[in-house]
Amino acid sequence: MRSDTREEISAALDAYHASLSRVLDLKCDALTTPELLACLQRLEVERRRQGAAEHALINQLAGQACEEELGGTLRTALANRLHITPGEASRRIAEAEDLGERRALTGEPLPAQLTATAAAQREGKIGREHIKEIQAFFKELSAAVDLGIREAAEAQLAELATSRRPDHLHGLATQLMDWLHPDGNFSDQERARKRGITMGKQEFDGMSRISGLLTPELRATIEAVLAKLAAPGACNPDDQTPLVDDTPDADAVRRDTRSQAQRNHDAFLAALRGLLASGELGQHKGLPVTIVVSTTLKELEAATGKGVTGGGSRVPMSDLIRMASHANHYLALFDGAKPLALYHTKRLASPAQRIMLYAKDRGCSRPGCDAPAYHSEVHHVTPWTTTHRTDINDLTLACGPDNRLVEKGWKTRKNAHGDTEWLPPPHLDHGQPRINRYHHPAKILCEQDDDEPH
């Protein structure tokens, strides 16, 4: 099997960079409209081919590199090194698995799983969205469809994709699915595989989108809850005392001007609020399951600004003050930048220390990690075996995978500002930040000129 030398690989990438630099310097004022479109078409071909060039690199990393070498999972390593989202990293890994060359257990090269699709991408005839449609088709196609038919379907879809937009390909793929698998996937196993609920990122106004697929059991459960709590007049936030337990009377129904969607929202809020208040969820990482919010004394007194939850959500002060009347949530206040000085000699952090770390760090302190406080563990910056103390000023938050990195060559330390610095082993050090500012965007935007690292 052919293998290029390091010098040949570096020279090829240098030539690629130089060629692209030449293209970037082109002045196209003399071109006509048809010529401009033709140039864009040629650039699109090369954009698509670049994706194919990445597959071998990603698959080789997946096969030879362990988490210790990568500094985490392959998904995390790609996201941090390439400055892409973890979701985009996962997409590239999945695409490489489907379209990149594989190796047998004996080391022999194997063709791509989606052979025709891979060939079309290498020629620049199809792009990312075409590939996404073809991958989605095979994700839904029943395993009962034999290999020969699957290969023929893949070849047909790849050929159709070369002359169509991705949105047009979708309709053809849907028709082909109807022919090959008219009854659909209705087994318990398929439903279990497809189930899921996703809560999107908070938008600028604090609102979040929710989407997903519900199993019949969850749908039936939600229907029963909504029948009670989303009925007209129930759980109406405009009422001085919203009705939850009792049946709304005619006057309560008449006052209710909410849409059904708004009543559904308020019903979910009432149900989950009641569950939190019940105390029946036990503990999570050493604290009762509840809402932990951090804010400053100044903002609380002014009733302006936003608090930040242990999950990383921003909560307007008006909501925060109202929430305080419904359950025993934790509110951590800062009258300055430093946390309270809390000490004890046990290795496990106390609940009070965890609350302060939720408020101070807001999430995993390793640079590049977006895990919120709810999904993080308490980490001793200086190993407990050295100090035998659990001092709030020597603690930080780290998610499970990052916490374990300390056993694999990573080191942590506190700087003069009280921030936790993560020092990678030499083979992973490419000049990346030492401090995680992801959970503190205000510090990035309003950082003072005090030589504070960021």
From Swiss-Prot:
Alphabetized GO MF terms: endonuclease activity; nucleic acid binding; zinc ion binding
N-terminal signal peptide: none
Disulfide bonds: none
Family annotation (InterPro entries): DUF222, HNH, HNH_nuc
Pfam hit, one: DUF222
Coiled coil: none
Domain HNH: 364-405
Family: Belongs to the Rv1128c/1148c/1588c/1702c/1945/3466 family.
Protein name per Swiss-Prot or TrEMBL: Uncharacterized protein Mb1179c
Organism of derivation: Mycobacterium bovis (strain ATCC BAA-935 / AF2122/97)
